[in-house]
Curated annotation (Swiss-Prot):
Pfam families documented for this protein: RadC, UPF0758_N
Binding sites annotated in the UniProt record for Zn(2+): 169, 171, 182
The MPN domain, residue ranges: 98-220
Protein name per its UniProtKB record: UPF0758 protein Asuc_0013
InterPro entries: MPN, RadC_JAB, RuvA_2-like, UPF0758, UPF0758_CS, UPF0758_N
Keywords assigned: Hydrolase, Metal-binding, Metalloprotease, Protease, Zinc
Lineage: Bacteria, Pseudomonadati, Pseudomonadota, Gammaproteobacteria, Pasteurellales
């Protein structure tokens, strides 16, 4: 076992995971280095290669395994960790007594949407206490657009007896700035929802490491 890999673990136990640098967290995940490259050095090299933790996590299998020192085993483990994080955030929403934590919602949506290379339009369907009933990817599109049909959203909302909605879609370009069509689409969905006494609580636009909230800007 390498002494370098013990240091981050000891730091985590003493001060908490939040005190660790990204490369230290990755070193704990990797556990060991390779010949002539201790695990700390390896983790730093991995992050430089992929640019960030987000770049590492969003890499596909081929991209991930191209880096010497990490392979299919680490790829599988990382995908499992990422999926567990998504499900944890989903459970946080599902089991919350009331939907009062916009930060949890935003982190969940960023985790779900920002890695897509095509535009995906998702909807969170909430009950009358603003607890999550389900999340559904309603529409998928191209690199810069997705066709969205308010009628389909409302039909699904009525089917699952939702009282409120949170809308979200990603911008693969990386910018979270809403377009004119995003604004118009939101108004159309909100108008259709109001006819059925369903509230639209927010619309998140997810970019690369950034987001835009219609509710935060009082656009709803």
């Amino acid at each position: 076992m390498e002494n370098q890999s013990l240091m981050p673990r000891e730091k985590l136990l003493k001060s908490g995971a939040e005190t660790l640098e990204n490369y230290e967290l990755l070193a704990i995940f990797l556990r060991t280095g390779i010949k002539n490259c201790p695990v700390i050095q390896l983790s730093q090299a991995v992050l430089r290669y992929f640019g960030s933790l987000r770049g590492l996590i969003s890499a596909d299998q081929e991209q991930f395994c191209q880096f010497k020192g990490i392979g299919i085993t680490q790829y599988i483990q990382l995908q499992a960790c990422t999926e567990m994080t998504k499900r944890y955030l989903a459970e946080e929403l599902t089991f919350a007594h009331e939907f009062t934590n916009p930060l949890t919602v935003r982190l969940y949506l960023q985790t779900e949407l920002e890695h897509y290379e095509r535009e995906v339009f998702s909807v969170l369907f909430l009950d009358n206490q603003h607890r999550l009933i389900k999340k559904e990817d309603m529409f998928r599109g191209t690199i810069n657009a997705a066709s969205v049909y308010p009628r389909e959203i409302i039909k699904t909302a009525l089917y699952c007896n939702a009282a409120a909605l949170i809308l979200a879609h990603n911008h693969p370009s990386g910018s979270a700035e809403p377009s004119a069509s995003d604004k118009q689409m939101t108004k159309r969905i909100q108008a259709a929802a109001e006819l059925m006494e369903i509230r639209v609580l927010d619309h998140f636009v997810i970019g690369k490491g950034c987001y835009f909230s219609f509710a935060e800007q009082d656009w709803l």
